[in-house]
Swiss-Prot record:
Residues 420-451, 479-490 have a biased composition (Basic and acidic residues). One of its GO terms (cellular component) is host cell plasma membrane. A motif (PTAP/PSAP motif) lies at residues 119-122. Residues 408-455 form a coiled coil. A zinc finger (CCHC-type) spans 490-507. This is Gag polyprotein. A lipid is attached at residue 2 (N-myristoyl glycine). Residues 139-157 have a biased composition (Pro residues). The keyword Cell cycle does not apply. RNA-binding phosphoprotein p12 is phosphorylated on serine residues. It comes from the Viruses.
Amino acid sequence: MGQNNSTPLSLTLDHWKDVRTRAHNLSVKIRKGKWQTFCSSEWPTFGVGWPPEGTFNLSVIFAVKRIVFQETGGHPDQVPYIVVWQDLAQSPPPWVPPSAKIAVVSSPENTRGPSAGRPSAPPRPPIYPATDDLLLLSEPPPYPAALPPPLAPPAVGPAPGQAPDSSDPEGPAAGTRSRRARSPADDSGPDSTVILPLRAIGPPAEPNGLVPLQYWPFSSADLYNWKSNHPSFSENPAGLTGLLESLMFSHQPTWDDCQQLLQILFTTEERERILLEARKNVLGDNGAPTQLENLINEAFPLNRPQWDYNTAAGRERLLVYRRTLVAGLKGAARRPTNLAKVREVLQGPAEPPSVFLERLMEAYRRYTPFDPSEEGQQAAVAMAFIGQSAPDIKKKLQRLEGLQDYSLQDLVREAEKVYHKRETEEERQEREKKEAEERERRRDRRQEKNLTRILAAVVSERGSRDRQTGNLSNRARKTPRDGRPPLDKDQCAYCKEKGHWARECPQKKNVREAKVLALDD
């Protein structure tokens, strides 16, 4: 150690890429600046013995973690950082010095000295028991002790200077609620990112017997991550309902784990609604919801039951409890009946029909007392799907022959055909451009036709006016020249006398007769 003055903090900063990978595996995000600030400035002020240079001492880490996770006066922004510190201490990477690893594999109660690189100090008693789960609300369940894991490698020996079995538990379920207190050499154990409260630990003891299960509780990091990444149940029930439904199927939580999930992820009012709805959905012997108090308490107890998950009866009880809890979640997610909310669910311009149908069915579940997956509700859902689809899909579906014989799946397939045949953005722009040009040409033609009609009307009106004034020829009307006044209707153009016209003028007749007499003579 004389040539190496590295501290736990400097080691983590020098290998920051590995530390960040650990955080990613734990589903949390950390930053290098805050990591250094919390370690050197924040945590030493908690008064639990955290040194500014950091430590891998589990008892000190648990003490800091207890303060960070306090309901009042806690530090939620520091949760990811202390969780990663704990993971580094419990599963140290290769770059942690051997002296630090010795302190890691020891239990917090048996840790005698400070971390490597610091002078020895008088041993201080442990502040908090190392086996306390920070988010546990009550004592561990009185489940029977799990069998020793047969898959553990027998060749792995104890660390130097350590008793063979003085600090290693017989398994993660043997008297502890922490799922990570295991030797770093145990590579056969579950990965820290996998959370399965009940896990198979070996083959059945009998040929047709049950596979033995071992208990591993949820980690605080995962509970924190679930709470942070999901909206509240009152705001969007689908998020937490889907999460718990998945957990019930894949993780097989115990009764205590279910209470922990309810306590962390839901408010008091939400928990009461969920439990009330769940007890309404307890099934009787006939498969219908029962109102018998004894059957309800037996299937969905409010107090911790004595169920052994390593027996067939206990597993069946847990299975019924989980199913009933999921039914309670779905029942509590329903709002007062409001069909107007269902009609507000419209398909988006680029939304696939299958996604739209899922949103529509979720609205039915939330705002109506009906189950849209039931056979009797298929027609109503189908009509809503057609009427609230995008205009092009709606037009296609309404033209289908024998529409009453189509199922929801058939309608979705027909809608998918229209959806996938839609033109691209470039094609749409080109089509709109051509349509605009065609509209412009039609408008020009209409304007030309209107102008032609106007000119024809003007010419026709002018000809009609000419006919009314007596000018029936194609010649232009003669207008008075040299300032001569026009003649009246009964005025003679020859003698300008009134009462006769020029062809009847007596003066003009006398002149013609005189000329004729002159020729005869």
